[in-house]
C-alpha cells in the first residue's frame, strides 16, 4: 500500500542559520515613506529614530534601503535630463568631439556602404606585399625566388640556409632562371635595387649559425630568432579584417612591435604643413552647406565655377548613406571624381618623408 503523505520539515541544522536580509513588504515601505515625509526638513534622516518607529528592522537595514532609494532617484533624474544615459544623443551633442572622431564621422559619411570593400582592399594590399621578392629575400633565413613567368616559386628552407649571402641576392629574384640560384648569386641582372633595403638584412642575426642542427635546443632557438616577412604581412592582413593570423616568433613579434612604436617617430618626418593645409581645405569643401549647392546638383559636374569640387564630395557624404539602390553610390563617386580608397584626396607625395633642408 502507498504510505500516507507527510509534510517535509526544514532540517534542524538550517534553522539557526541566517538566510540573508528579508525583503521589505509593501506595508513596511509605506510606513518608511510616511516617516521620511515627516522628516522632510532634515538634511539626513536618522537611522536610530527610524529604527524605533520601524519594528523588526535594524539600523543597517534601514541605511541600506535608504541608499538604494537615493541611487534610484539619481538614475531617474539622469534619465530625464539625458535620454538614453551617457550614450544618449543629448549627451553626445553636449560633449565636444575629439578631432579623430570628427574625421571618422566624415569618413563614414563619405564611404557609406563601401566600408567592407575598403577593408578588403587594404587587406589585399598587405597580402600582395607578402609575395614581394625583397620581403622574401630579407627574411632570416632568406627565401630566394626564381621568376618563371607565372608565379614565384619558393625554395626550400634548407636550400635557403646554404645561401652564403642572401643580402647580396637582392636583384636576383626578378630575372634569375637558374634552378640553383645559390651558384649564380654574384650575377645581378635586375635594375633598380634599393641599397637602403639591402642594408636591413644584417640587423636580424641568427645566433650560432655553426651550431649542429641535430640538437633540439638549437633548432628551437633558430625557430625563435627566425624572421619571415611573408608571415608578418599575412598577420597584418588578417588582423586588419578582424581574423586570427599566423603565430609569430619572438623576433617577428618584436618587428611588429617596433613598427607600431615607430609610427609616432615617423609622423614628424612627414610634410606636416602641407598636410594641414590640404586637410583643412578638404574639410571645408566636404562640410560646405548643402542648401546653397542644391541648384548645382542637376547640371553635370564640370561647370564654370569652381564650386563643383565641394559639391561632389558633399553629395556623396549626404546622399550615399540614404540611397536605396546599391548602384547609386557608384554613380555618385563617378560623378564626383573621388576615389573611394582615398576619400580625402590626399596626394601620395604628402605621405612620404619630407626632404631634409640642405645645409
From Swiss-Prot:
GO terms for biological process: snRNA transcription. Residues 1-11 have a biased composition (Basic residues). Pfam families: SNAPC2. InterPro entries: SNAPC2. The keyword Zinc-finger does not apply. The keyword Transcription applies. It is found in: Nucleus. Residues 1-25, 158-222, 287-331 are annotated as: Disordered. It comes from the Eukaryota. GO terms for molecular function: RNA polymerase II general transcription initiation factor activity. Keywords: Nucleus, Transcription, Transcription regulation. GO terms for cellular component: cytosol; nuclear body. Residues 308-325 have a biased composition (Polar residues). Residues 293-303 have a biased composition (Basic and acidic residues). Part of the SNAPc complex composed of 5 subunits: SNAPC1, SNAPC2, SNAPC3, SNAPC4 and SNAPC5. SNAPC2 interacts with TBP and SNAPC4. Part of the SNAPc complex required for the transcription of both RNA polymerase II and III small-nuclear RNA genes. Binds to the proximal sequence element (PSE), a non-TATA-box basal promoter element common to these 2 types of genes. Recruits TBP and BRF2 to the U6 snRNA TATA box. This is snRNA-activating protein complex subunit 2. It comes from Rattus norvegicus. The lineage of its organism: Eukaryota, Metazoa, Chordata, Craniata, Vertebrata. The gene is Snapc2.
Amino acid at each position: 500500500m502507498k504510505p500516507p503523505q507527510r509534510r517535509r520539515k526544514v532540517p534542524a541544522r538550517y534553522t539557526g542559520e541566517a538566510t540573508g536580509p528579508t525583503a521589505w513588504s509593501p506595508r513596511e515601505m509605506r510606513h518608511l515613506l510616511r516617516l521620511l515625509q515627516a522628516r522632510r526638513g532634515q538634511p539626513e534622516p536618522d537611522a536610530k529614530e527610524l529604527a524605533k518607529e520601524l519594528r523588526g528592522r535594524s539600523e543597517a537595514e534601514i541605511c541600506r534601503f535608504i541608499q538604494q532609494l537615493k541611487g534610484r532617484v539619481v538614475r531617474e533624474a539622469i534619465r530625464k535630463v539625458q535620454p538614453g544615459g551617457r550614450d544618449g544623443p543629448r549627451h553626445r551633442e553636449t560633449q565636444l568631439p575629439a578631432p579623430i572622431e570628427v574625421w571618422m564621422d566624415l569618413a563614414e559619411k563619405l564611404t557609406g556602404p563601401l566600408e567592407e570593400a575598403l577593408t578588403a582592399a587594404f587587406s589585399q594590399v598587405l597580402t600582395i606585399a607578402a609575395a614581394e621578392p625583397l620581403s622574401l629575400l630579407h627574411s632570416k633565413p632568406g627565401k630566394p625566388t626564381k621568376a618563371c613567368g607565372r608565379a614565384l616559386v619558393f625554395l626550400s628552407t634548407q636550400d635557403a640556409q646554404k645561401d652564403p649571402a642572401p643580402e647580396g641576392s637582392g636583384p636576383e629574384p626578378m630575372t634569375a632562371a637558374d634552378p640553383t640560384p645559390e651558384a649564380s648569386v654574384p650575377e645581378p641582372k635586375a635594375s633598380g635595387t634599393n641599397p637602403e633595403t639591402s642594408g636591413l638584412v644584417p640587423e636580424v642575426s641568427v645566433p650560432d649559425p655553426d651550431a649542429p642542427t641535430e640538437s633540439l635546443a638549437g633548432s628551437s632557438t633558430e625557430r625563435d630568432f627566425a624572421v619571415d616577412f611573408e608571415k608578418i604581412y599575412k598577420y597584418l592582413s588578417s588582423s586588419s579584417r578582424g581574423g586570427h593570423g599566423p603565430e609569430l616568433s619572438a623576433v617577428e613579434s618584436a618587428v611588429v612591435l617596433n613598427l607600431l612604436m615607430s609610427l609616432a617617430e615617423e609622423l614628424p618626418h612627414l610634410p606636416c604643413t602641407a598636410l594641414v593645409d590640404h586637410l583643412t581645405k578638404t574639410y571645408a569643401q566636404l562640410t560646405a552647406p548643402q542648401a546653397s549647392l542644391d541648384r548645382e546638383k542637376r547640371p553635370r559636374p564640370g561647370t564654370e565655377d569652381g564650386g563643383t569640387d565641394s559639391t561632389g564630395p558633399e553629395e556623396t557624404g549626404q546622399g550615399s548613406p540614404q540611397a536605396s539602390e546599391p548602384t547609386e553610390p557608384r554613380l555618385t563617386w563617378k560623378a564626383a571624381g573621388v576615389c573611394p580608397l582615398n576619400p580625402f584626396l590626399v596626394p601620395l607625395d604628402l605621405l612620404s618623408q619630407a626632404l631634409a633642408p640642405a645645409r
